[in-house]
Each structure stands twice: as structure tokens, then as C-alpha cells.
Amino acid sequence: MKILITNDDGVNSSGIIAARRAVEDLGETIIVAPATQQSGIGHALTLFEPVRVSEVTLRDGSGAYAVSGTHTDAVIIGIFELMDEKPDLVISGINMGENLGKSELTTSGTIGAAMEAAVHGVPSLAVSLQVRRGDIKFHDGHVDVDFSLAAELTGRVASRILRRGLPEGVDFLNLNVPSHPASDEIRITRLGDRMYNVHIKKRLDPRGRPYYWIDGDPAGTDFRVQMSTHLRLKTPPPSPPYHSTAQQALTQWRAGLIRARN
């Protein structure tokens, strides 16, 4: 089995190392990820400048490939250039920060990378871990983040995908892990309508010219309450006639995941 691991937090993220460790016993792994932080740009692809690839050594001493472009570029280059054949699974993550709701479907790079793999017929899994503050992802390596549960679940779900494939009608999975779950039960959910209320912060540069920070605060929303108690495994909504069928197939697939664990 061959597993391609990528992310949008960058090749030096602690989360991508945790992802590799979680699945290294399941098959041959290769990390191909963007050289720099690419969060929030969705399914972006580099079209108007060359994309360069460098071999790098991660902080745990393992090797990886750093791509000068986006996570989407990394998936394409990994599948069609760096690997001899298509991988059996692509894992995107482990992302610092949850990816919930329909808005995240179009803005999340973690989901975008998994989606790109699915476009090319490769089963994929996006994994995101809730963190205390949204800015933690920008201080990776300086703030301790406990990936243990997210890594354990990544390995469990990845093993299920490799053994049984994805459920009928499902192209990829999006797994969200709360920072302090009430249990390790995995629940199937639907995508919510919105994740956060948008806040725009206006500031002035030294020359008096305005600039803006776009921010979101999930505190107090149903997403925050939901993520604080249970693990979430969900899929983007397929076209309406097939939505219930895919949900049923995923629920049955999850039952097999629980039986396999026991």
C-alpha cells in the first residue's frame, strides 16, 4: 500500500509528522506538501508561474518533498511525478484547526487537497484537529499541540479505507477531532450552513493608508458546541438525489469501523 500525505499548513508542520507516524505501519508513505503556509485558499492551483520541488528533512529527521506552490499542486506532483503509480490513499492533515460547514468546503486547503486527490480517483481523507486558538497554526513548533487522539483516529480510519475502500457514493472523508472530546465515538454529520460570523478589522499603515484583516469567531455557535463534545466524520453533500444514499452507506461503513476496532 502506498500513502501520499500532504497538508495546507506547510511541510514543516507538526501535524504532517503526526499523520505520517499514524499510518507508517500501514504501507509506504511519502510526504509532498507546500513549502509555506497555504491555509484558507481552498482548491487553488498554480498556473502562472513555475512550481519547484525540493527534498527537505523534517524536524523528526524524516524526508519529504517541499513544493513551492499550493497543496493542490503538491497532490498533483506527488501523484503524477514523484510516485511510480497512483497511491492507494491520500491523507491531508493533520490540520491545526477544525474545518466545518459549507463555507470551509470552498476555503479549506486541507479539504481542497483531499478533493484534488478524489478528482484523480484516489480515495482521500482530510483530518483536522480543533485547537485552543486560531493563531496557534501560525506558531507551529512554539506551542505544544497534542495530536495523539487525532493520529490514532487517522490510523484507524485510514486502515479501514485501505482494507474496504470508501462507502458507495463517497469520494473522500472529512474527519474533525475536538481538542477535548467527551468520548472517542465517531459520529456521521451533515455540513452546516456556516461556521463563523465574519469580522473585518480595519487598520492604518504608517502612511495612513487603510488595510484590513478578515477574521472569524466560531465561539458561541452550534459548530463550537458540536465540536466540543464529539468527533465528526462527514462528507461534502453529493447531488440531492444521492445524498441520503451516501449517508446510509457511510453509516454502515462506520459500523464496520467500530467492529474492526473491537
From Swiss-Prot:
Its cofactor is a divalent metal cation. A divalent metal cation binds at residues 8-9, 39, 95. It is an enzyme of class 3 (hydrolase). Pfam families: SurE (PF01975). It catalyses: a ribonucleoside 5'-phosphate + H2O = a ribonucleoside + phosphate. Nucleotidase that shows phosphatase activity on nucleoside 5'-monophosphates. Binds 1 divalent metal cation per subunit. GO terms for cellular component: cytoplasm. Its EC number is 3.1.3.5. GO terms for molecular function: 5'-nucleotidase activity; metal ion binding; nucleotide binding. It comes from the Archaea. It is found in: Cytoplasm. This is 5'-nucleotidase SurE. Keywords: Cytoplasm, Hydrolase, Metal-binding, Nucleotide-binding. Belongs to the SurE nucleotidase family. Its main location: cytoplasm.
